[in-house]
């Protein structure tokens, strides 16, 4: 199993503001959906997120369609039946290895927030791949991605990930994929 981190991050490491995204970039949302839903036939991907990330998703998009939704929270008191709630990232991984899920899960995607990103990057049991939308400017944020040295990561060129730079709604951005070396530390 590999842990895949999906993140849009500004040059000042920002990922969120006021419980939501600090930008509206349709192309990034399309990238997120494509990356997290593309699975082998007969399988589904799992998206693992913290409570605040779950709560930031508009009701009309809950659950994230065609994916197994797992929320990591010790305080979420009630959740719809279509969502699995677990107390930790390790519990989420254990759940995905149980009989109910192990035969239907293709890839696991960590989609936020900070604590889960940090745990995924810090652990050394599973290989980590980062699918990143680099927002090529500093953005006013109150939630941040753990700092990594992008130059120490192995850039991965995938045929379905565009190498171009795009501009939308005043934000210039590009998509990149990185493999995190096992000796990477956060």
Curated annotation (Swiss-Prot):
Q: Which residues bind substrate?
A: 28-33, 67
Task: Say yes or no: keyword Oxidoreductase present.
Answer: yes
Q: Does the keyword NADP apply?
A: yes
Q: Which UniProt keywords apply?
A: NADP, One-carbon metabolism, Oxidoreductase
Q: Cellular component terms, GO, for this chain's entry?
A: mitochondrion
Entry EC no(s): 1.5.1.3
Q: In which pathway does it act?
A: Cofactor biosynthesis; tetrahydrofolate biosynthesis; 5,6,7,8-tetrahydrofolate from 7,8-dihydrofolate: step 1/1
Which parts of the sequence belong to the DHFR domain?
Answer: 2-180
Q: Which reaction does it catalyse?
A: (6S)-5,6,7,8-tetrahydrofolate + NADP(+) = 7,8-dihydrofolate + NADPH + H(+)
Q: Name one GO molecular function term.
A: dihydrofolate reductase activity
Q: Name one GO biological process term.
A: one-carbon metabolic process
In which residues is NADP(+) bound?
Answer: 8, 14-20, 51-53, 73-75, 112-119
> Which InterPro entries does the entry link to?
DHFR, DHFR-like_dom_sf, DHFR_CS, DHFR_dom
Q: Which Pfam families match?
A: DHFR_1
Summarize subunit and interaction data from the UniProt record for this chain.
Monomer.
Q: What does this protein do?
A: Key enzyme in folate metabolism. Contributes to the de novo mitochondrial thymidylate biosynthesis pathway. Catalyzes an essential reaction for de novo glycine and purine synthesis, and for DNA precursor synthesis.
Assigned protein family: Belongs to the dihydrofolate reductase family.
Name-wise, this protein is: Dihydrofolate reductase
Q: Which organism is it from?
A: Schistosoma mansoni (Blood fluke)
- What does UniProt list as this organism's lineage? Eukaryota, Metazoa, Spiralia, Lophotrochozoa, Platyhelminthes
Gene that encodes the chain: DHFR
């Amino acid at each position: 199993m590999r842990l895949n981190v999906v993140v849009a991050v500004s040059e000042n490491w920002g990922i969120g503001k006021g419980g939501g995204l600090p930008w509206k970039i349709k192309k990034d949302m399309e990238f997120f959906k494509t990356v997290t839903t593309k699975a082998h036939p007969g399988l589904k991907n799992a998206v693992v997120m913290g409570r605040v990330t779950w709560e930031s998703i508009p009701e009309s998009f809950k659950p994230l369609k065609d994916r197994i939704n797992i929320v990591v929270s010790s305080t979420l008191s009630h959740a719809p039946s279509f969502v699995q709630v677990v107390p930790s990232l390790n519990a989420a991984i254990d759940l995905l290895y149980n009989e109910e899920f192990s035969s239907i899960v293709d890839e696991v995607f960590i989609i936020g927030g900070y604590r889960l990103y940090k745990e995924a990057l810090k652990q050394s049991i599973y290989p980590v791949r980062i699918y990143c939308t680099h927002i090529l400017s500093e953005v006013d944020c109150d939630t941040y991605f753990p700092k990594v040295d992008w130059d120490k990561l192995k850039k991965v060129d995938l045929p379905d990930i565009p190498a171009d730079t795009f501009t939308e709604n005043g934000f210039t951005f590009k998509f990149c994929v990185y493999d995190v070396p096992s000796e990477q530390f956060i």
